[in-house]
């Protein structure tokens, strides 16, 4: 009876409605919903906005009725009691007017004459709320003076901090080689992960949802794009949501290059293992899925694996992928630099010699370990010893520190 065939779905729908009605009844007296009837002006707030509203009511020292909603389904009886008691009510919630619209419906029965305020001129539909925004909305409703939000002087003093990959991150090297080969006119769909931080390298044109890099790349190609298309996603993202997109690209003969940034972990969200690491979430050894074998089985005509720290070989591999007449896959494999250092792996750092000509090519590479001072590059203590900056330096001025 749990298989939703038509004969089962109809009674299951009735069961669901009955469960929701029972939940609604139970929540009328739940501690998460709190009603305090006071003056003829009221506030209905949900979630974190309820805490902001309570603090604002205390500061304004007004006799305001207050309903804090902390659970769904909405407590309709509590809302109706509030509406019957007040002549004006302000609904405070983040983003869309979900609660506000329900309040408007209930008001037709409870109190058709009540004035309902909310998203029109008081609470924004975008962004998150804060205390000053809520406090000023209540003050505006009451006709009282609004307060200016506290200014953070650090915002105007500190330089902007654009998105950036870690020092020594192999994704930076992969993207550098990718851009070197595919150029400015190419399309670069990307995905969800720490590699999204490479947006300033000019190789992240889209970021929609997990696995969308491949499907977007296919769609762009079949939409008539003639320039090169090179998409990118991580190993975890590929195994989670990219395989069907790759199969679809192969099946439909999409001429695109898919770059799988394999750092052997799920770095963006806490370094969890994935099926390609050979380890479960509890640390047990398990089957290690081969991304190369998967890519070939799903129909990719060209599959190559590179170490992005080896810049020349990586560029050559991307060149072959660009020229390939069908679906090509480049697997850029190098362990996450944070995970590698935690496991005890150490490389010799690099330094800049007097041969530096100040061309700033290494600075444009975007590594946080590279600074520029007195017309010369300088490598700071963040250096992990990946050596990619040395590989791209035209004057061979970056060299490994001798120990």
What is each residue range found by the language model?
Residues 55-66, 184-185, 293-299:
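Short helix-loop-beta junction
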Residues 1-165, 170-171, 308, 316, ...:
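Flexible, low-complexity linker and terminal segments
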Residues 65, 187, 255, 301, ...:
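Residue-level detector of anion-binding/catalytic polar loops
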Residues 41-42, 88, 187, 228-230:
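Structural motif
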Residues 148-214, 223-226:
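Active-site diphosphate/adenylate-binding microenvironment
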Residues 47-49, 191-194, 262-265:
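Short glycine-enriched loops at secondary-structure junctions
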Residues 197-331, 341-343:
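Thiamine diphosphate
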Residues 44-46, 189, 232, 259:
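Short hydrophobic segments within beta-strands
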């Amino acid at each position: 009876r749990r298989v939703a065939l038509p004969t089962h779905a109809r009674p299951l729908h009735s069961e669901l409605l009955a469960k929701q009605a029972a939940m609604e009844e139970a929540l009328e007296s739940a501690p998460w919903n709190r009603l305090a009837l006071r003056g003829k002006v009221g506030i209905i707030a949900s979630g974190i906005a309820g805490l902001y509203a309570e603090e604002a009511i205390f500061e304004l020292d007004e006799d305001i009725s207050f309903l804090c909603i902390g659970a769904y389904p909405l407590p309709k009886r509590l809302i109706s009691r509030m509406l019957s008691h007040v002549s004006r009510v302000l609904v405070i919630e983040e983003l869309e007017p979900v609660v506000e619209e329900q309040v408007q419906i209930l008001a037709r029965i409870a109190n058709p004459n009540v004035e309902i305020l909310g998203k029109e001129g008081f609470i924004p539909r975008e962004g998150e709320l804060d205390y000053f925004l809520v406090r000023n909305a209540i003050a505006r409703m009451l006709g009282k003076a609004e307060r200016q939000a506290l200014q953070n002087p650090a915002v105007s003093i500190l330089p902007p901090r654009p998105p950036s990959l870690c020092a020594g991150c192999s994704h930076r090297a992969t993207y550098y080689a990718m851009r070197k080969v595919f150029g400015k006119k190419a399309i670069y769909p990307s995905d969800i992960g720490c590699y999204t931080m490479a947006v300033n390298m000019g190789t992240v044109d889209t970021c929609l949802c997990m696995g969308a890099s491949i499907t977007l790349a296919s769609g762009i190609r079949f939409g008539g794009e003639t320039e090169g298309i090179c998409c990118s996603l991580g190993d975890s993202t590929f195994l989670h949501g990219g395989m069907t997109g790759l199969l679809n690209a192969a099946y439909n003969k999409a001429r695109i290059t898919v770059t799988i940034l394999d750092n052997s972990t799920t770095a963006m969200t806490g370094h969890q293992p994935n099926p390609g690491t050979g380890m479960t979430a509890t640390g047990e050894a398990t089957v290690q899925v081969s991304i190369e074998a998967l890519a070939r089985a799903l129909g990719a005509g060209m599959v190559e694996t590179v170490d992005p720290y080896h810049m020349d070989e990586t560029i050559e591999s991307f060149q072959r992928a660009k020229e390939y007449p069908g679906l090509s896959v480049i697997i850029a494999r190098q362990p996450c630099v944070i995970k590698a250092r935690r496991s005890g792996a150490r490389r010799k750092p690099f330094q800049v010699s007097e041969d530096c000509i100040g061309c700033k090519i290494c600075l444009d590479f975007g590594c946080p370990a590279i600074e520029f001072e007195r017309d010369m590059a300088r490598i700071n203590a963040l250096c992990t010893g990946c050596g990619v900056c040395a590989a791209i330096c035209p004057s061979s001025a970056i060299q490994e520190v001798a120990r």
